[in-house]
Amino acid sequence: AVLVSVMLSQGQANAQFGFPRMNMDSLNALTNADHADMMSKIGVTSLRPGKDGYSTDPAIGANYDQYIANPYINYPDALTTFDGRKVKNAKMWFKVRRPELVKVFEDEFYGHIPANVPDVDWQTVSEEKVMVGQTPCICRTLAGVVDNSSCPEISVTIQADIVWPESAGNNIPVIMEYGFAVGNSPMMMMPMGNGPQRKPWKEQVVERGWAACTIVPTSFQADGGHGLRQGIIGLCNKGEYRKPDDWGTIRAWGWGVSKLLDYFETQPQFDATKVAIEGNSRYGKTA
C-alpha cells in the first residue's frame, strides 16, 4: 500500500491529548518512574535544564532568532552512503542508502518495532447511514482487537471509523487523520481553528467521492510515559519497562495505522494504494 502523509502545524494544538482523565499525580508518578528507569539503563544521571520559552532573559530564555541559532551547517549528503559511495541509481537507493537511513532513524529516533507484535482482528462495531454535509454516507466504526494471549492482563483495541459516500462504488481513495474520537459526532465534523471557516475536512473529502477515516492513537498507546507499560508497547513487553532501543509512542502510533492499511487491503470499497494521512503536532510527526 502507498501512504502519503501530511503534517499540520496549526489547528487544535491539543489534538493528541485524547487519553481518559486520570489523577495527574498518579500520571506524573508513573511517568517519572519510567523516566528514571530509562535514565539508569543508559547511564545518565542528570539532564541540563531546558530553556524557558516564555522568558525574555537571554540567559535562560529560548532563542527565536535563526541568525544566532548556530545552525548545524555540515549536513550529510542524502545521496552518499555512510561508507562514502555515491548513490548512482534507484536500485542502489532502495537496496543500500534507504535501508541504512531507516536504521539510523530506528536506532536514534523512533526505536524498533519488536518481532513479537501480535496480530490484530478487525471487527465492525457498527455501520449506519449518515449525512455528512449534503452527502448521504455510510459510517463504519471499527475495533482492531489485538491478540493478548501472551499477556492477558493487558488489553489493547485500536479505535477507528471510516465514512464514505453511499454512491461511491469500490476502490475509492482514503484520507486518514490521527484524531481523538470516532463516530459521526459533532466534534468530528466541526471546523477547527480561528481563521476563515471552511467546510469540515470530512465533508470536503466525501464530496469528492472519497472515504474519510479517523484513527485514535491513544486508544492503543497512551500519549505519555505513564502508559509505556500498557497499550501495545506494554503488551509486547508483558508489562515491563522498555529497553533503550525499544519503540516509543510515535512508532507505536504509526504501527496502528499500518494495521489499518492491512484492513483496507481486505475491503473492496477502498483502494489501499491511494491513502493519505494527516495529523497535528505530535500526530503530524507521526503521519
Language-model-detected regions and their locations in the chain:
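Cap/lid segment of the alpha/beta-hydrolase catalytic domain
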Residues: 170-272, 278
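N-terminal cap/lid segment of alpha/beta-hydrolase-fold proteins
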Residues: 90-91, 95-98, 107, 112-174
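Glycine-rich nucleophile elbow surrounding the catalytic serine of serine-hydrolase chemistry
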Residues: 279-287
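Boundary at the C-terminal end of the N-terminal hydrophobic targeting segment
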Residues: 9-17
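Intrinsic-disorder/low-complexity accessory segments
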Residues: 23, 27-34, 39-46, 151, ...
